[in-house]
Amino acid sequence: MPTISRQEYVGLFGPTTGDKIRLGDTNLFIEIEKDLRGYGDESVYGGGKSLRDGMGADNRMTSENILDLVITSVTILDARQGVIKADVGIKGGRIVGIGKSGNPNMMNGVTPGMVVGVSTDAISGEHLILTAAGIDTHIHFISPQQVEHALSNGVTTFFGGGVGPTDGTNGTTVTAGPWHIHRMLRAFESLPVNVGILGKGHAAVAMPLVEQIKAGVAGLKVHEDWGATNSALRNALRVADEMDIQVAVHTDSLNEGGYVEDTIDAFEGRTIHTFHTEGAGGGHAPDIIKVASQMNVLPSSTNPTLPYGINSQAELFDMIMVCHNLNPKVPADVAFSESRVRPETIAAENVLHDMGVLSMFSSDSQAMGRVGENWLRVMQTAHAMKAARGKLPEDAAHNDNFRVLRYVAKITINPAIAQGISHVLGSVEVGKMADLVLWEPRFFGVKPKLVIKGGMINWAVMGDPNASLPTPQPTFYRPMFGALGKTLQETCVTFVSQAAMELGVKESLGLERQVMAVHNCRAISKKDMVRNAETPTIEVDAETFAVRVNGEYATVKPVRTVALNQRYFFS
């Protein structure tokens, strides 16, 4: 059999097993662990290439038995799959195959269900990286334009609350009451992302919560600005257990209703998603970070403090004053803001992410966080932690696969598991909805090349539409056909409770998007957090705020420069 050099092969078909890829300008290198295609029978689109009539494309089969879309020879980076090279087959908006595509009449080893034919389109993935699209579980629905910025950084799913720029929405991720819930469910009909709405979890009895769950929320939020009391937490968790939804909490910074130990007691061992697990964004001062040691706690933190930089402390004060309706002329308000910003716990937050103790990243959009920077901050933090802490014990000698996959999990599969949507989204696996992001390695984590939503490209870097090619300047992100008309509704999902599904919320509100129920939100724990399931003992010194993890001081110095930064942006 004829052979070619590895360098020639990479030029033609992209990297294969054993090849390494640098991610942007970071210090992170991934190595392809296995290749599921067949050497010499690769599916390649283009003039003179193999995916032609009667060659790699079957010219007899009808659409029923062939792919709608094939992504050829792409490097898959997925928290569950690892780092693999494969073709990815999409049909009906879902992933139906990962392996070898083509024409089984002419090619050996074609994976069942991955036949290419007359009804198949192709994306050339030879020199690209494919990930599951990002999931942001901490969105303040302040402005609909957040969607554009999120898509431009590879995020296709929003979980959060709010109704626009009210003071309540600016401070809390809560859509309060059936009237607001129904208006927001209808508003999202025209926005090209998946969505799940969080209702207000503050009640002394069940019915005010139950009516929101039946109205169509996918979870509840308990927030200190509305009173994160132990009674509210217990009641919300009790109702959530009965109706299989998730509860998110932003705890009591002022410790008015109790301390962190009291809040842990109020959880009563039940599953809960803790926002701001470090505390700069809010929560028991100074030691909310201790909840990350609990098996029933699914901990996330937000991107303003990740990675920990020399300006992190300074910018957080003003963020808090604006978001939480505080007055800089009132000493008590100033003290409240200052109590939340602790460099020692911010440094520890970064370390705990690197150790796999904090399981998820989110943005806290326009309410102390940046919705268009989740993938960016994930990769910047991974780079900064490798620079500060060296290789992880789990990493191989010559690649950073484990560390990179740990961080990818924080923005893909783990948020999906926490919010009860991992049966639909969160990973590059057969059967999942085809919400996928294609990246050029040099732009990984910064600027995706294509965002695929439900099997259709809905967001992409595109040049001048009046040019003779797609590439001439100015190139910037533009909505594609998948984000328009009825196709938007066919490729996007609104997540609601099972109770709302059974009551026919889709029909009663006239929703045209796909509507699906969240499930398995309660019978999960920290051990289900992929590559981020550690539960060490965490202690915080009440005087110095120093954090110790299993007795060892957990800290890093603030970074002065970060990867994936000004080299990639004009400002």
UniProtKB/Swiss-Prot annotation:
Domain Urease per the UniProt entry, residue ranges: 133-571
One cellular component (GO) term of this entry: cytoplasm
Q: Kind of enzyme, top EC level? A: hydrolase
Annotated pathway: Nitrogen metabolism; urea degradation; CO(2) and NH(3) from urea (urease route): step 1/1
The note describing how and how many cofactors are bound reads: Binds 2 nickel ions per subunit.
Determine if Transport is one of this entry's keywords.
no
CC cofactor: Ni cation
Where's the active site on this chain? H324
- The positions annotated for binding Ni(2+) 2 are K221, H250, H276
Q: What is its EC number?
A: 3.5.1.5
Highest taxon, organism lineage: Bacteria
Single Gene Ontology BP term?
Answer: urea catabolic process
What UniProt keywords apply to this chain's record, in alphabetical order? Cytoplasm, Hydrolase, Metal-binding, Nickel
Reactions performed catalytically: urea + 2 H2O + H(+) = hydrogencarbonate + 2 NH4(+)
Q: How is it modified after translation?
A: Carboxylation allows a single lysine to coordinate two nickel ions.
N6-carboxylysine modification sites are K221
Q: Please list the disulfide bridges.
A: none
> What HAMAP family does the database record attribute to this sequence?
Urease_alpha
Its name, as the record gives it, is Urease subunit alpha
Source organism per entry reads Photorhabdus laumondii subsp. laumondii (strain DSM 15139 / CIP 105565 / TT01)
Which gene name does the record give? ureC
